[in-house]
Amino acid sequence: MEDMNSKIIEKLEYNRIIRQLSDLAITAPAKAQALKLMPSSDFDEVKKSIDQTRVLSNILRVKGPMPITDFKDVRPSLKRLKVKANLNGEELGNIFLVLSLAKDVGQFASDLEEREIDTRPIEKYLKNLAVPEDLFKKLNQAIEYDGTVKDTASSKLMQLRHDIQSNETDIKNHMNDYISGKHTQYLSENIVTIRDGRYVLPVKQEYKNKFGGVVHDQSASGQTLFVEPQAVLVLNNRQQNLLAQERQEIHRILIELSELAGAYQKEINNNALALTQLDFLSAKSKLAKKMKATEPVLNQDHIIKLRKARHPLIDPKKVVPNNIELGTTFDTMLITGPNTGGKTITLKTLGLLQLMAQAGLFITAEEGSQLTVFNEIYADIGDEQSIEQSLSTFSSHMDQIIKIMNNVTEDDLVLIDELGAGTDPEEGASLAIAILDDLRQTQAKIAITTHYPELKLYGYNRKRTTNASMEFDLKKLAPTYRLRIGIPGQSNAFAIAHQLGMNEAVVDKARDLMNDEDSDINKMIERLTEQTKAAEQLHETLKQNVDQSITLKRQLQNGLDWYNQQVQKQLEKSQEKADEMLAKKRKQAEKIINDLEEQRRAGGQVRTNKVIEAKGALNKLERENQNLANNKVLQREKKRHDVSVGDNVKVLSYGQQGVITKKLGEHEFEVQIGILKVKVTDRDVEKIAAQASQKKPEKSVRSSRGLRSSRASSELDLRGQRYEEALTNLDRYLDASLLAGLNTVTIIHGIGTGAIRNGVQQYLKRNRHVKSYNYAPANQGGTGATIVNLQ
């Protein structure tokens, strides 16, 4: 696009855009790069560049600008290192600055990664920020950014500078004695000055021998001699010697640092290039923010669809945004109408925004605006204010048009201002039509302006061609600068004359002098203008309604999300509270069981039903915890019924049926289960129908304890269960069997790996309610089952 750019950059004022871009860059190399930024015709390259601008804009919005400060171009220093030359302090200080900035930006990038901010389009630059630690450490110890060598560069330099400071103090003390004591009468002024790096006194000429020493200089009149007193001569000599040693040590340090830097030329260059590129891209994002620009949506279909596009160089408070289209339902747009209405600015806006996008810059248009990537952009744009053009201007205009016609292709954009102007109107109009017909055959995208009325019908007679015009406010007698696509320019001469007070009869006569065809065209344009305005107003109203609906939907969704989050938080809090309560109750139940077991081991008499009752309470707590975990609280609440004395109920913690015999409290009852009376809460019982408790039992057994069970079975099958699950079920089963009065039960555990079988045997061995146990006979399962006798 070099040829295209060299011709249109000045006309479209693209150079003013990149000057603004350069001003927003921080480093000198990035500023220079910005001034060289040219649009690209490679779609992939443009998209990549736009992506980078988007990433930096997002970073600027979320985290702020990158920590980059100005540094000088390191390439001259690297060239010197390449030929083994030594660098001075300023050059090494600049390299140290580059490495320090690389470290800072690297940390900045790490923070972006932690915040999960996308940096993929600039990843290669971030990866190049690799600082050689040994070089950085040495430079940090030895040199300042401005090139000053630090005291810490070497122990020798530190000692030398200490000695220099101490010796200088001694010199000043001696000299101060001269200018404040009895010797002041011999001095022209009571000051200490320096000549040739040595401290001297301004002595009157006639007293030059009073101080001894050496005369270093004299005043212009010869009345004052600058004398180095004999008393400080030795100190000054020592000072000069120390300073010479300091210079020598600094020289040695710079040589050492240069040699170390020479080993990392590639790394230094990579860091500098990465910082330059990141600064350059950051400038793009800053320009977008400054202009309130948005990311263009690129397409490969040569479609332009700009919404509320505004010229980026016109005051935002004054510029009028316009919708501009090409390549949708038409490829050629003719903007007709009088001069000074904004036709040229519209062309320039289209061309400049297209150039900006192809340079990877954001555009001054509404979000979602579409642009494409053209191979070339041809433009012939003159001065909008020039109504009459000279023959030489017409020749220049035609010369440009001919070049465009000879080179344009379907992949190009053509912008022509006042096509065919500068010659006889009739010939100019005919020439414009012929040129347009020729250009349209190339299938390029074309936008032209003209004030020839003959072209008004062109858009209606040619395929994929449309008219457009700049709106004019008849009440204010001023252009509105709004583009009206689909409507040709309307002549407003009669309306303006009437508004200004011209005799109505004169205006009417002028209308009568117009031929019927022209009159009909103007009436048609007037109707189209009114219809378009009405349609646009309706569209704007509908758009506002849609935007409000989208906003409301977003607010409602946010509210719903917040509500769901609050509900979830409350559920989690309730779960935590319930877990704490259940853990507390579990400890209480375990303490009861442990106390009972302790009493038994101590020889006390503990009733079996007390132990079982305590275990039942523990089982109840475990089941409540499971219900909470599975979120089945509401299901249990639905099943619960109001109960009262005399109701037949099922006690959930025991899995047994009984009858409520007494109400102990608001939520507490006494239930008779066989001969056993237990205390329960209303949450632990379910009311059952009277007939349910009188069903024929699966197995009815009366024990010596007199307890009858309608639910207990003489067998328990543990096959297929996990180890812990099997032992838990075994414990509960034996409790229920004891309550049911069963004397003998069979535990089916299978053979398998023997884990459950061994676990069962170990459990039975410890349980004091087990009288004896043995494997079942061969015909009843053998070692796959155990017969247990209870006591």
Swiss-Prot record:
Domain of life: Bacteria
Alphabetized PROSITE patterns for the sequence: SMR (PS50828)
InterPro entries, sorted: DNA_mismatch_repair_MutS_C, DNA_mismatch_repair_MutS_core, DNA_mismatch_repair_MutS_sf, MSSS, MutS, MutS2, P-loop_NTPase, Smr_dom
Pfam families: MSSS, MutS_V, Smr
Region annotation Disordered: where it falls in the sequence: 689-715
Annotated GO biological process: mismatch repair; negative regulation of DNA recombination; rescue of stalled ribosome
Keywords assigned: ATP-binding, DNA-binding, Endonuclease, Hydrolase, Nuclease, Nucleotide-binding, RNA-binding, rRNA-binding
Positions that bind ATP: G337, P338, N339, T340, G341, G342, K343, T344
Presence of keyword Mitochondrion: no
Domain Smr: 716-791
An annotated Gene Ontology molecular function: endonuclease activity
SMART domains to which the protein is assigned, alphabetical: MUTSac, MUTSd, SMR
Biased amino acid composition, Low complexity: 703-713
Record-listed E.C. numbers: 3.1.-.-, 3.6.4.-
Record flagged with keyword Nuclease: yes
Function field: Endonuclease that is involved in the suppression of homologous recombination and thus may have a key role in the control of bacterial genetic diversity.
Family to which the UniProt record says this protein belongs: Belongs to the DNA mismatch repair MutS family. MutS2 subfamily.
Oligomeric and partner information: Homodimer. Binds to stalled ribosomes, contacting rRNA.
NCBIfam families, per database record: mutS2
Identification of the protein by name: Endonuclease MutS2
UniProt organism field: Lactobacillus gasseri (strain ATCC 33323 / DSM 20243 / BCRC 14619 / CIP 102991 / JCM 1131 / KCTC 3163 / NCIMB 11718 / NCTC 13722 / AM63)
Gene (UniProt): mutS2
